């Protein structure tokens, strides 16, 4: 018995075209182009979710380093002193302190001064 793909194909096409909303021109309207663009888009999304973590970590390092240099020390010395002093503040929190609460950051820096 012959099986037609009418319903299955329509569902698949609808699913792809629904996900392709917001794309430009034929990449939104034509199934094949939409499917190709969607594949690429999903690849970019997957890759950049990993990249985002690296980008934010490097941003935090830059911010902490800038705050440390205002107090005549370097990022690497400061992080080593934190480890030696057994203070477990992560880079995200330290960068936030450096940006929004310099007084708190300075107090942390003063508390590890003896380990520098």
Swiss-Prot record:
GO terms for molecular function: rRNA binding; structural constituent of ribosome. GO terms for biological process: ribosomal large subunit assembly; translation. Coiled coil: none annotated. One of its GO terms (cellular component) is ribosome. InterPro entries: Ribosomal_bL20, RIBOSOMAL_L20_CS, Ribosomal_protein_bL20_C. It holds the Pfam family Ribosomal_L20. Keywords: Ribonucleoprotein, Ribosomal protein, RNA-binding, rRNA-binding. PROSITE patterns: RIBOSOMAL_L20. Binds directly to 23S ribosomal RNA and is necessary for the in vitro assembly process of the 50S ribosomal subunit. It is not involved in the protein synthesizing functions of that subunit. Belongs to the bacterial ribosomal protein bL20 family. HAMAP family: Ribosomal_bL20. This is Large ribosomal subunit protein bL20. It comes from Helicobacter pylori (strain G27). The lineage of its organism: Bacteria, Pseudomonadati, Campylobacterota, Epsilonproteobacteria, Campylobacterales. The gene is rplT.
